């Protein structure tokens, strides 16, 4: 009997960056058109990666401040985090290191992080950018820079609407959870003892 390993994957990030859309796009190959703020939700699916079947538990969390005390309850037992920001929102990009990294490092310090830039289809959409003058595009190099700054394992950009790279986000997360990176060891300080 082949027992599949359970992997808990938790999505975090500001409200309205597309976390729920990314999960729905991945699990049902559809794109929801109505925005409904998430309080908490989860999905489960059996997935085959590199010939191994895993039971992937997807935990969707609310990014709104109203849920700051409730959200960390979903972090317990996480194998990997998908930390999402919108590629058309400078505020969500900045909150990755201002809000989300401190929260994740406090509640789940050793869990690997996949940094995800969402809404890739809108980054170069001239009509959208014209209609939304407050939208500021985040470049791939800025995402890579942020990945290094926060110590994420990898960075990937996706579009839930077009499904570009959505499967890749979850494939990478599963592979990281199955073979998490070894934590960097702090150098051991040698203490010496001197007798006088």
From Swiss-Prot:
GTP binds at residues 13-20, 60-64, 118-121. The modification Cysteine methyl ester is found at residue 193. CDD domains: Rop_like. One of its GO terms (cellular component) is cytoskeleton. A motif (Effector region) lies at residues 35-43. One of its GO terms (molecular function) is GTPase activity. Keywords: Cytoplasm, GTP-binding, Lipoprotein, Membrane, Methylation, Nucleotide-binding, Prenylation. Gene3D superfamilies: P-loop containing nucleotide triphosphate hydrolases. It is a peripheral membrane protein. It holds the Pfam family Ras. It comes from the Eukaryota. Its main location: cytoplasm. One of its GO terms (biological process) is establishment or maintenance of cell polarity. Residues 194-196 form a propeptide. InterPro entries: P-loop_NTPase (IPR027417), Small_GTP-bd (IPR005225), Small_GTPase (IPR001806), Small_GTPase_Rho (IPR003578). SUPFAM superfamilies: P-loop containing nucleoside triphosphate hydrolases (SSF52540). A lipid is attached at residue 193 (S-geranylgeranyl cysteine). Belongs to the small GTPase superfamily. Rho family. Inactive GDP-bound Rho GTPases reside in the cytosol, are found in a complex with Rho GDP-dissociation inhibitors (Rho GDIs), and are released from the GDI protein in order to translocate to membranes upon activation. This is Rac-like GTP-binding protein RAC9. The lineage of its organism: Eukaryota, Viridiplantae, Streptophyta, Embryophyta, Tracheophyta.
């Amino acid at each position: 009997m082949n027992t599949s390993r359970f992997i808990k994957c938790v999505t975090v990030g500001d409200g309205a960056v597309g976390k729920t859309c990314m999960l729905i796009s991945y699990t049902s190959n559809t794109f929801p058109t109505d925005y409904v703020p998430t309080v908490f939700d989860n999905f489960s699916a059996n997935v085959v990666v590199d010939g191994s079947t895993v039971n992937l538990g997807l935990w969707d969390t609310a990014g709104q401040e109203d849920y700051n005390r409730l959200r960390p309850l979903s972090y317990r037992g996480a194998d990997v985090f998908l930390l999402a920001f919108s590629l058309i929102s400078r505020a969500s990009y900045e909150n990755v290191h201002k809000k989300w990294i401190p929260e994740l490092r406090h509640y789940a310090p050793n869990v690997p992080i996949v940094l995800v830039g969402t809404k890739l289809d809108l980054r170069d959409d001239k009509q959208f950018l014209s209609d939304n003058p407050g939208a500021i595009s985040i470049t791939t190099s800025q995402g890579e820079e942020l990945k290094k700054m926060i110590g994420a394992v990898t960075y990937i950009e996706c579009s839930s609407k077009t499904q570009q790279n959505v499967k890749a986000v979850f494939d990478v997360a599963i592979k990281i959870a199955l073979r998490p990176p070894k934590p960097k060891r702090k150098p051991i300080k040698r203490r010496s003892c001197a007798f006088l």
